[in-house]
Amino acid sequence: MINRRYALLLIALGTLLLVSCVVSLGFGPARVPLDVVWRILLHKLFGFGVPDWNPGQEHIVWLIRVPRMLLGALVGAGLALIGAVLQAVTRNPLADPHLLGVTSGATLGAVIVVLHVGEIIGLLTLPIAAFIGALLSMLVVLMIASRHGRLDSDRLLLCGVAVSFVMMAIANLLLFMGDHRASSAVMFWMLGGLGLARWELLAVPTASVLFGLILLLGMARPLNALMAGEQTAVTLGLNARTVRLRVFLIASLMTGVLVSISGSIGFVGLMVPHIARRLVGAEHRRLLPVCVLLGSVFLVWVDVAARTMIAPEDLPIGVATAAIGGLFFIGLMRRR
């Protein structure tokens, strides 16, 4: 009975995600009727129908909104997945992808390149610079946290927060002293957004989310044991340090990839795992797929709100998720 309910929940969430993805393509500064969206998708994916729509509508839907929608679904899924496993290994309900220092490292890399190097390899310049910054930040956190051979969760989080503050201070100083026109460009990226979405940029985030999900699902039992406490994990024969290190590396690499293309989008990895646990409990083989689906649906619709609320301008997604996340946790605290 429980397995049947879980299967029905996955089917319902999967259906909701598919419907959300299609319906969201009609929203934006230029409205495209849903029947036109549907015909464009059928024609592009399966060759059905005769293109009797406006070429401008096809350009908007297929080249702008579909990549953006797919990137939003991937980023939402990835951040929710990372948040769930970090909350498990740290046993901290407030842990999220941005506590590891990776986001601030990506920000610093982006700031340095935009202000002092320029777009030497075109559209890929900013994502590559951000990813390199994220990797360097991850290595610094790891070196400091494991200096004395220990890698407990408190030390990991504290090192991540400390490195994050230092890197953000350097990034803000460079922005303050740099060219203001370039600063405004990188500021929008720092606030989070899906404006960089292009078909050619989707392969790497897709691979990172899929491989991350497979690897972390394979670690579901160790994650369950760590949630019960380090002593329980040791009793079951697990090496808590090794499990924690593997999760940290997977989470950091995924965060680096996602942040490099979407900027800093907060609260998804913090809020979605809490909602998922209320639906299916804390067993990670059941929890992680639900987190992925919920995170995707959530960010697809937040992006719709971001591009329609102050149209024709784009509201940074990080602003929208921060507002929703803050209200969510205020409501949660009031209920308790």
Ranges and model annotations:
Residues 1-336:
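Alpha-helical transmembrane segments in inner-membrane proteins
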